[in-house]
C-alpha cells in the first residue's frame, strides 16, 4: 500500500473499491461473465488508485493542472432488478462511493485518478449488465 501522503480521498476511494470487490466476490456466478469482468475492472481501479497515491508521495510538491469543482453525482441511477441481486447492488453502492471520492480528490496523481475513474465507470456498467443478465434479461 502506498504512503498516506495526506491523500484521504484516495484512501477512501481505495477502501470503497475493496468493499466493492468483496461484494462482487460474494455474488453468485450466474451473471453471464459480467461479474468476473467487473471484478477485473475493480482490481485494475484499485491498482490505479494505489499508483496515484504512490505518485503523489513521490511528487509531494507537484501541484498539477488547475481543476474545477468535481462533477456532481447523478441524482438517480436506478438499477432495475438490483433488489434481487443484493451483493451486486452493494457493489454498485461502493463503486459510486469510490467514484465520488476520486472526483473530490485533489489533482490528477500522474493520470492515475482519471484512469481509476474510467475503470470504475466501466465496472458499474458491467455490474448493471450482470444484474440484468441474472434477472433474465439476456
Segments (PLM) and residue ranges:
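Long, charged/polar, soluble alpha-helical segments
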Residues: 2-138
Amino acid at each position: 500500500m502506498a504512503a498516506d501522503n495526506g491523500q484521504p480521498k484516495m484512501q477512501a476511494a481505495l477502501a470503497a473499491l475493496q468493499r466493492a470487490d468483496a461484494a462482487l466476490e460474494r455474488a453468485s456466478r450466474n451473471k453471464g461473465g459480467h461479474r468476473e469482468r467487473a471484478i477485473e475492472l475493480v482490481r485494475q481501479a484499485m491498482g490505479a488508485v494505489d499508483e496515484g497515491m504512490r505518485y503523489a508521495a513521490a511528487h509531494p510538491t507537484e501541484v498539477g493542472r488547475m481543476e474545477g469543482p468535481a462533477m456532481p453525482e447523478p441524482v438517480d441511477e436506478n438499477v432495475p432488478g438490483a433488489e434481487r441481486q443484493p451483493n451486486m447492488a452493494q457493489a454498485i453502492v461502493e463503486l459510486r462511493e469510490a467514484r465520488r471520492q476520486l472526483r473530490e480528490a485533489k489533482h490528477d496523481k500522474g493520470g492515475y485518478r482519471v484512469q481509476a475513474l474510467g475503470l470504475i465507470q466501466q465496472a458499474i456498467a458491467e455490474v448493471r449488465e450482470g444484474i440484468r443478465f441474472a434477472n433474465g434479461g439476456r
